């Protein structure tokens, strides 16, 4: 049983690493200026070929939920929902230690995505001058 608990903590650590990687790539796409170094980033809609036409990175911003679906209650609800969902997923991941690893990995990936979107909505509006706290666009 202890081994499963270690796995849950390992999965949370992997989720943390995925969130860091997700945010680093988003900052690289959006651009930044730090300590005299400026990286211009990509233009909205710009696409970069990674492996020919098979794999391309395209800069898009999502104002809503999955697939751009808008929600009537506004950004503050989506931001809080992302936070609450992330907390719930952490709790659930720690509680289902006996579940199959595939289920736990799927939950870990959903957690990383939900928390990454929370960070986007929370801070990107302020950092990039697009809106107040809680009103940033999700960079996809």
Which residues are covered by each model-predicted region?
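Alpha-helical transmembrane bundles and membrane-interface segments of multipass inner-membrane proteins
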Residues: 1-140
């Amino acid at each position: 049983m202890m081994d499963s608990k270690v796995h849950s903590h390992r999965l949370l650590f992997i989720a943390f690493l995925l969130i860091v990687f997700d945010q680093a790539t988003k900052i690289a796409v959006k651009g930044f200026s730090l300590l005299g170094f400026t990286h211009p980033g990509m233009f909205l809609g710009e696409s970069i070929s990674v492996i020919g036409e098979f794999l391309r990175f395209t800069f898009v911003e999502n104002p809503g939920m999955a697939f751009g679906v808008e929600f009537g209650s506004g950004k503050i609800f989506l931001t809080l929902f992302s936070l609450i969902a992330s907390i719930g997923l952490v709790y659930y991941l720690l509680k289902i230690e006996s579940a199959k690893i595939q289920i736990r990995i799927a939950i870990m990936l959903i957690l990383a995505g939900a928390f990454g979107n929370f960070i986007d909505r929370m801070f990107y509006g302020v950092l990039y001058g697009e809106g107040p706290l809680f009103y940033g666009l999700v960079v996809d």
